[in-house]
Design a protein with these regions (language model features):
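Basic, Lys/Arg-rich alpha-helical nucleic-acid-recognition elements, primarily the DNA-binding modules
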Residues: 183, 194, 210
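Alpha-helical DNA-contacting segments of helix-turn-helix folds
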Residues: 197-215, 245, 249-262
Length: 274
């Protein structure tokens, strides 16, 4: 199975779209892995592939009767076991926490929908053409031009500030303190996060700290520092707090997790089981 990740090239898209990856699986041998919570909103498109979600399991299978499939994943709190069966052709877009709102005015209607993600009239046709394109360079031009054509002027001053505050790992501001600072209520903050981010602020912060820990782990490995230092640098209160958070988000202790995960540029998304 071949996976290529690309950072967004166009400066106009960079504030909203972190990047995208192209996945090709030609072998009939099944691949299974665990993927872990993150704060991106992911949109995946497939050609001749069926996707079935049940609890914390996703089965992605070759299906020659399905010309096009598209899904949106906004939030999950525990690992998802993913099985790839047969030949797979996939493109996945990784939008920043508020990013997709700048393309869709009513994003929240898709968060809990079981229907295929088809946000625009020309979406299926364009994404199918992208999936069928053999050149990565041409694919990148096509997909970035498409998302640029859908870009709108979404702007929410309060929410932008709240998300920025939550991303500050060197400060531990409570939701109550944020409500006081921005003259709003805890309830309104929860409502805004649920509507525009797809998860509550507590989960958002916990996942962000976890992801920061993955990123910092690379630097600590270079410096030969231990996991206790990692916990402090990622703003976990103590070692037991870090262990609890890791078990909640990954199903593993930090030691087990870091022994099995492939860390590359702090991504740490996949834990292959077979």
């Amino acid at each position: 199975m071949q996976v290529k990740f690309y950072k967004t090239a166009d400066e106009r898209l960079k504030p909203y779209l972190e990047g995208y990856y192209f996945l090709k699986k030609e072998s009939l041998v099944d691949v299974e892995y665990l993927t872990f919570p993150n704060n991106f909103i992911s949109v995946s498109v497939y050609h001749k592939v069926g996707v079935n979600f049940q609890d914390n399991n996703a089965v992605i299978s070759q299906n020659d009767n399905l010309d096009f499939t598209s899904i949106l994943v906004a939030s999950y709190k525990s690992p998802i076991k993913v099985n790839y069966n047969g030949k797979i052709n996939e493109v996945t877009f990784c939008f920043k926490p508020l990013g997709l709102n700048s393309f869709l005015p009513n994003l929240s209607v898709y968060f809990n929908s079981s229907k295929s993600f088809l946000p625009f009239d020309d979406y299926r046709e364009t994404m199918t053409a992208i999936l069928n394109e053999s050149s990565d360079e041409v694919k990148i031009i096509m997909l970035e031009n498409y998302w640029l054509s859908k870009l709108n002027d979404f702007n929410h001053f309060l929410l932008d500030n709240l998300v920025s505050e939550m991303l500050k790992v060197d400060e531990q501001v409570t939701i109550t303190e944020l409500a006081l600072k921005y003259d709003t209520s805890r309830q309104n903050i929860h409502k805004l996060f649920s509507r525009y981010v797809g998860k509550n602020p507590a989960d958002f912060r916990k996942i962000h700290r976890f992801r920061e820990a993955l990123s910092k782990r690379i630097d600590l490995l270079k410096e030969d520092k231990n996991l206790t230092v990692l916990g402090y640098e990622a703003l976990f209160y103590d070692q037991s707090h870090m262990v609890k958070a890791f078990k909640s988000l990954t199903g593993f202790t930090p030691k087990q997790f870091f022994e099995g995960i492939e860390l590359k540029n702090g991504a740490g998304n996949w834990f292959f089981t077979k």
